[in-house]
């Protein structure tokens, strides 16, 4: 599958994966901070952004997304890149780490480490946000996001500091949630089928937003039990999408996680 992507920088390759209904531009504030030391590939996952659709028989699980990323790497000649993912992209990154097909994995507030209540909460928030945003024309949404109070009300569950993101950027980011592609409903209906890896074959780092309201940082305890060798850090002042809240902190974490390790 030929995934839409943006490439910049030079050095060891780092693949950046976004969350559900998001897009590769969600990494725009982080990518320039990495590009001086890494070759950065920001990628739209299948059925997101400008990438092709998933097949009609897609059942909502993670495996086909990881398969598509692996196929993309083969097509681009990327041999075992580092991979970094947020939310859904974080779970895909951990799946690739379990397969051993990447050099290292960094996951930011990865999905899947929820209890039943946490899973129902995530489904309710995402489904409710879609229902709220779908009837609002883009121009009207842009006007609403220009108001600090409404911007916080609309995206405060995703960002701890919504004021740090340009309203035009947020409007574009929310398009995938207000007008999602077919996999969105399939994924929401089958969140209980998302299995989390029980091993990592490569060095693995996790950053969890201290102020994540969608997937609270308490879920990191489940991750620690599943992946005891992972290095887990709590990201102060960050919500569910830390790339928007503190791009410098995220870049620092990624650069540290992707530095060559002593043999």
Listing of model-derived features with the role each one plays in the protein:
Residues 4-53:
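Conserved HGGG/HGGXW glycine-rich cap/lid loop of the alpha/beta-hydrolase fold
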Residues 8, 41-88, 252:
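Active-site loop/oxyanion-hole signature of alpha/beta-hydrolase fold enzymes
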Residues 18-20, 81, 85-87, 209:
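Conserved alpha/beta-hydrolase "nucleophile elbow" surrounding the catalytic nucleophile
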Residues 90-100, 105:
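Short glycine-enriched nucleophile-adjacent loop
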Residues 102-137:
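Flexible "cap/lid" loop of the alpha/beta hydrolase fold
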Residues 140-198:
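Conserved alpha/beta-hydrolase catalytic His-Asp/Glu region
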Residues 179-225, 234:
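Conserved serine/cysteine hydrolase catalytic core
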Residues 238-251:
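Catalytic histidine-centered segment of alpha/beta-hydrolase-like enzymes
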């Amino acid at each position: 599958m030929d995934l839409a992507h943006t490439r910049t920088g030079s050095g060891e390759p780092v693949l950046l994966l976004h969350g559900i209904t998001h897009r590769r531009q969600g990494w725009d504030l982080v990518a320039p901070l990495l590009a001086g030391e890494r070759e950065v590939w920001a990628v739209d996952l299948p059925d997101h952004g400008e990438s092709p659709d998933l097949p009609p028989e897609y059942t909502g699980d993670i495996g086909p997304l990881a398969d598509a990323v692996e196929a993309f790497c083969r097509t681009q000649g990327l041999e075992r890149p580092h991979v970094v993912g947020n939310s859904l992209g974080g779970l895909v990154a951990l799946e690739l780490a379990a397969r051993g097909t990447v050099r290292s994995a960094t996951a930011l507030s990865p999905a899947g480490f929820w209890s039943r209540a946490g899973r129902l909460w995530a489904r309710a928030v995402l489904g409710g946000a879609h229902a709220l945003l779908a009837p609002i024309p883009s121009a009207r949404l842009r006007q609403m996001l220009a108001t600090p109070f409404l911007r916080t009300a609309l995206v405060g569950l995703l960002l701890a500091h919504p004021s740090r993101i340009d309203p035009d950027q947020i409007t574009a980011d929310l398009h995938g949630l207000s007008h999602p592609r077919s996999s969105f409903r399939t994924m929401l209906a089958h969140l209980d089928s998302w299995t989390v890896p029980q091993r990592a074959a490569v060095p693995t780092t996790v950053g969890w937003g201290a102020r994540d309201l969608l997937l609270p940082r308490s879920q990191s305890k489940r991750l620690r039990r599943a992946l005891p060798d992972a290095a887990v850090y709590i990201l102060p002042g960050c919500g569910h999408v830390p790339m928007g809240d503190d791009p410098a902190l995220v870049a620092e974490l990624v650069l540290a996680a992707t530095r060559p390790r002593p043999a």
